[in-house]
């Protein structure tokens, strides 16, 4: 029995576009929707979604550690836009009050600018990570196809061919796959 058939997933992200992207990747990696025990995304229009994820992360991680940290095979997947911050700066902000270790089944994904940057790259319509592709991909559906494509891309590509945020994401997915 593979790790993925036993593992369950908790997802914390900004919006439905990110959620669909994560689900698409997970499906391609061997998880199905029944593996998702928790999906938490910012209520539309309530506040800055990036801020909401940052504020929610500490509580979610503590719940994850307390409820699932001992003996259960649960993976926590977090996605937050980088906006104008680098991947490392955004991760540092997120983990300001609580740190994740490399051995924990916690993965943090930070699309530079926003998830639409990754969509543009996967479509071959990409100039750089600083450009905002949100308008062009705002109504793109389903986003899950991009998650599936990223899985294939991570498995087949050299990291040096990827934008920095995608290189980091592929490393995070690889680390989770090895746990």
Regions found by a protein language model. Give the residues of each.
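Short hydrophobic beta-strand segments
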Residues: 10-12
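C-terminal accessory helical subdomains adjacent to catalytic cores in phosphodiester-
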Residues: 1-8, 17-45, 54-179
């Amino acid at each position: 029995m593979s790790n993925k058939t036993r593992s369950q997933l908790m997802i914390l992200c900004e919006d439905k576009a990110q959620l669909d992207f994560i689900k698409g990747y997970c499906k391609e990696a061997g998880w199905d929707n029944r593996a998702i025990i928790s999906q938490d995304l910012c209520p539309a229009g309530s506040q800055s979604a990036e801020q909401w994820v940052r504020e929610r992360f500490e509580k979610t991680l503590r719940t994850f550690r307390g409820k699932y940290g001992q003996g259960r095979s649960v993976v926590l997947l977090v996605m937050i836009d980088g906006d104008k911050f680098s991947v490392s700066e955004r991760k540092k902000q997120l983990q300001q009050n609580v740190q994740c270790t490399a051995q924990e089944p916690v993965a943090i994904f930070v699309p530079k600018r926003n998830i639409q940057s990754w969509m543009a790259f996967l479509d071959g319509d990409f100039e750089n990570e600083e450009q905002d592709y949100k308008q062009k991909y705002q109504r793109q559906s389903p986003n899950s196809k991009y998650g599936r494509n990223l899985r294939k891309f991570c498995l087949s590509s050299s990291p040096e061919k990827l934008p920095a945020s995608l290189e980091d994401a592929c490393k995070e997915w690889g680390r989770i796959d090895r746990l």
